[in-house]
Amino acid sequence: MQLAWILWLASVLPPQAADSLCLSATVYLEARDQSARGQQAVAEVALRREESGLWGDSMCDVVTARKQFAPTIVSPRTRLGNTEAWAQAVSIAIESERNWALPPGERKEIVPGASHFMAHAIAAPSWRNAYQVATIGDHTFLRVQRLRPREG
């Protein structure tokens, strides 16, 4: 299946299903070759951004914000062809959403406060000197600014 098809499907699904699909695609594209912990950390960054409201009002808005996550960086024709990795990404996304639905004090956070991450194989972005929260696999997770949950 192609990324373009997944994003189209997300546009016609009910919001909760669409958000799960968008998060799954992001975990797959960003971290399919990483450990489960690395995949959970990627999902956590996306969920933290969604909660902040600074990158959009839904998970699909967050992960399709210009040049923020793989769904807007890779070609829409990118095939998500590894069925085992896709199944793992879906599982990680759903598990991460359940965890993030808990009150903040009860969540299991892997990269506390991280709002960004970078793959070591990619050129370092301008915020590369932010506070490093963790390195998991070939990703470094960073806190660039203090994110506050939106009110209400």
PLM features: what roles do these ranges have?
Residues 8-9, 13-152:
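Bacterial extracytoplasmic/cell-wall-associated proteins, especially those involved in peptidoglycan
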Residues 1-8:
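Sec-dependent signal peptide recognition
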